[in-house]
């Protein structure tokens, strides 16, 4: 599957994580961002790209920001924004603790300090 624009729900989550991570001009970053779904059983993880040529980078991987929320079925979900060695975000990892598909991204999130 190719890259696409984030949905409104994905955009809301990505913008929250970008703000926590201290990304300069997070709204502009989001406007330029394209995403591609990852094979994760439907939990919602995304590969991130500002240009079609962006590729995940090998080397150091940094967790830039994480939030937690409950899916509409009550199961806890952790969403983490990862960046490569040049601090360019390349992945949104979404982990639903029971590994079931994500039903809905909520409107509020709880920041995970770390």
Listing of model-derived features with the role each one plays in the protein:
Residues 71-114:
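Short, compact, well-ordered microdomains
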Residues 1-67, 103-114:
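N-terminal domain-onset segments
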